[in-house]
Amino acid sequence: MVQGFDPTLILWLNLIGTFVFGLSGGLAAVRARLDLFGVLVLALVVALAGGITRDLLIGTPPATFRDWRYLAAGGAAGLVTFAARPVLERIWNVIQVFDAAGLALFCVTGAAKAVEFRLGPAPAIILGAITGIGGGMLRDVLIRQIPTVLKHDLYAIPALAGAAVVVGAHGAGSNSLAFPFIGFAVCFTMRLVGLRFNIQLPIAPSERRTKSGAVEVPRAPDGPADGGSFSQRP
């Protein structure tokens, strides 16, 4: 747990983030024409897989299996998505804002938990990012897509940046409560700016030969990115 934070507050913030991430998985499942069970599975995967992966890599029992409320939040998100998809579609921009907040929260708390277990700076930053993006990556694998965080959308980078703030502050010997908030703000702001201005990471051009034998190097697409774990509609 982040030092100095009210454990009850952190719990409820994590549950809110779990619910919002569950909406992402549920919407992806509904669009993939999965049945109710499939919707629930994908909602739980997106909501919980990042934290489970982090805890297993650290070597501690996953928090998901020690507190039933995490499973309840993810499952509730799946049921809400299954029953109310049209409503969720209409408020998509609002959900994206909450998702950005969930990503920021999870990367900060994930990095803080790794630091508590005395991991080095690089592993702690990576585990912080995994906490935020791991569920979306597994979701894409289950619906047979290239994980969207591996493409050119700003999703993993903000998570890494937010986690780096927390880990860097700890490495400098600071226990100030300001740094978790700063890490949250960095990740949250980067994510929203990336969405607002469609900021994308560059991709390598691919070579293609024309009928005359000349090499044609196509430009990278100018359209919107496929999105991160929740950047666009899954």
Residues of each region from the PLM?
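Helix-coil boundary and interhelical linker segments in multi-pass alpha-helical membrane proteins
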Residues: 1-9, 56-66, 110-123, 168-179
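Structural signature of hydrophobic alpha-helical transmembrane segments
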Residues: 6-18, 41-44, 62-76, 120-132
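C-terminal ends of transmembrane helices
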Residues: 22-32, 52-56, 79-92, 137-148, ...
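Cytoplasmic-side transmembrane-helix entry/capping segments in multi-pass membrane proteins
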Residues: 37-45, 66-72, 92-103, 123-127, ...
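Short, structured motif recognition centered on aromatic/hydrophobic residues
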Residues: 41-45, 52-58, 126, 130, ...
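Small-residue-rich segments of transmembrane alpha-helices in multi-pass membrane proteins
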Residues: 43-51, 74, 99-112, 130, ...
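Membrane-proximal helix-loop-helix units in multi-pass membrane proteins
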Residues: 84, 90-148
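Short, highly charged, low-complexity non-transmembrane loops/tails of multi-pass membrane proteins
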Residues: 202-227
